[in-house]
A protein has these predicted regions:
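Beta-strand-rich ligand-recognition modules
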Residues: 151, 158-211
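Loop/turn elements at helix/coil->beta-strand transitions in domains of secreted/extracellular proteins
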Residues: 23-28, 188, 267-271, 304-310, ...
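Substrate-gating cap/lid alpha-helix
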Residues: 30, 314-352
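Extracellular beta-rich ligand/substrate-recognition surface
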Residues: 117-129, 165-172, 249-250
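Surface beta-strand/loop "capping" patches
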Residues: 121-125, 129, 135, 141-146, ...
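An acidic-aromatic loop/edge-strand motif
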Residues: 1, 30-118, 188-258, 264-267
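Alpha-helical scaffolding within the catalytic cores
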Residues: 174-175, 250-263, 289-297, 327-337
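Aromatic-lined ligand-binding clefts that engage carbohydrates, nucleic acids, or primary amines
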Residues: 106, 134-162, 191-193
């Protein structure tokens, strides 16, 4: 429904929609996905038998005592508590996000310069605060408004005129915040961003939209917008050491298979759309074997030896100057192609041309979904002719 579709897979939605529009046959889709997951987490213990390294890792984490001890040792909660306690912006008499806060002694900066993110020698983790005043007309103040803040590394909380309007806890999602009706007023308004840096790369991602959109967000149709690039006020809130890492136990071998595939085996499944790989690029030399093992494993579990798999090619990513990184991604795409070439009923869906150099999760899932739909419809028509 329109109310619950947003957290769902955009690729799966557009694929199913396109198939339905062309066939008038409803398509049932199951979304079983976890961002950032490695392929070995999606393979059963039986399927991992050819990979003793991963089987051994799996058995290590079978110990409840080990898992509990690791959870107790990990300090991420303590790090966040220390950050909140030490953040001056939250504890002054007038908090830094307040509409009437006096930021006249703050530093002028540009969001995309690196000067604010460093102490001269190293990047600074912790909290960084930004404020910007902007003018709104009486007409704009009465319209629906959406705040676009590109992508931010790592996390953020955002306020408009002292009112909290949204937060994202990690770097990848586009920042799209609704400004509640009545919050903007004719004349001067203020946006405050509290940016959190965990791992030494605080930044606002370049070449993304930083603006306020009014109405339906269609400036090409005459609706207004306010550009938020340019000068901002800046102040460091709380410098911190790098945040301690956390162990993603569900990423361990067999973890996601047991939790998210095994419970689905009683469903009748016609095929699989497989969009994964970024987390395996550093181990690309083994990916062909691992993905082939996963395909065979799932086919055995569903007792369908020819169950179709549609592998989504990894999208283009990284700056043109990052030769090493781009080479690694190209080699990974080659491994994906080899899986499709050497396994029956496995199709590679082109996606590299839909990538964005500055976004590991490119936004155009509609075109990609239509490509998957086209591949499946071709296969259906071929079978029908037989």
């Amino acid at each position: 429904t329109p109310e619950n579709v947003m957290p769902f897979s955009a690729l799966a939605y557009f694929f199913a929609k396109d198939v339905y529009q062309k066939t008038k046959v409803p398509v049932g889709i199951i979304n079983s996905s976890v961002g950032g997951s490695p392929v070995e987490a999606w393979i059963s213990e039986e399927g991992l038998k050819p990979f003793p390294y991963y089987l051994n890792e799996k058995r290590i984490y079978e110990s409840d005592d080990l898992v509990e001890s690791m959870k107790k040792e990990e300090r991420s909660h303590a790090w966040n508590v220390a950050l909140c306690q030490g953040d001056k912006g939250m504890h002054e008499a007038t908090p830094w996000y307040a509409a009437d806060y006096d930021d006249s002694n703050w530093t002028e900066t540009d969001l995309f310069t690196s000067g604010w993110a460093t102490n001269g020698l190293n990047t600074v983790n912790g909290s960084h605060w930004f404020r910007k005043d902007f003018q709104v007309s009486a007409q704009q103040a009465g319209e629906k408004a959406t705040l676009r803040l590109g992508c931010i590394v790592d996390a953020d909380s955002v306020y408009v005129n002292g009112t909290f309007v949204g937060t994202v806890s990690y770097q990848y999602p586009p920042r799209i915040y609704t400004i509640p009706a009545g919050l903007l007023k004719a004349g001067k308004n203020t946006i405050t961003i509290r940016l959190f840096s965990y791992g030494g790369r605080p930044q606002f991602v370049k070449e993304k939209p930083y603006k306020i959109l009014f109405g339906k967000g269609q400036p090409e149709k005459g609706e207004s917008e306010i550009n938020l690039e340019g000068s901002w006020k800046y102040h460091l809130g709380a410098p911190m050491p790098a945040a301690p890492g956390q162990t993603a136990f569900h990423y361990k071998p067999t973890g996601l298979y047991n939790a998210m595939i095994a419970p689905l085996l009683n469903y009748t499944v016609s095929g699989v759309i497989w969009y994964q790989g970024e987390s395996n690029v550093s181990r690309r030399n083994e990916y062909k074997d691992l993905l082939t093992a996963m395909i065979s494993d799932w086919r055995q579990r569903w007792n369908k030896s020819d169950m179709p798999f549609y592998i989504i090619e990894l999208a283009d990513f990284l700056s043109p100057t990052d030769k090493g990184g781009r080479t690694a991604w190209a080699e990974f795409r080659k491994a994906q192609a080899e899986v499709a070439d050497t396994n029956k009923n496995v199709t590679l869906i082109k996606n590299s041309d839909l990538g964005e150099w500055n976004d590991i999760h490119p936004l155009d899932k509609k075109t990609l979904g239509q490509r998957v739909a086209a591949a499946i419809l071709i296969e259906m028509n071929t079978k029908n002719r037989k």
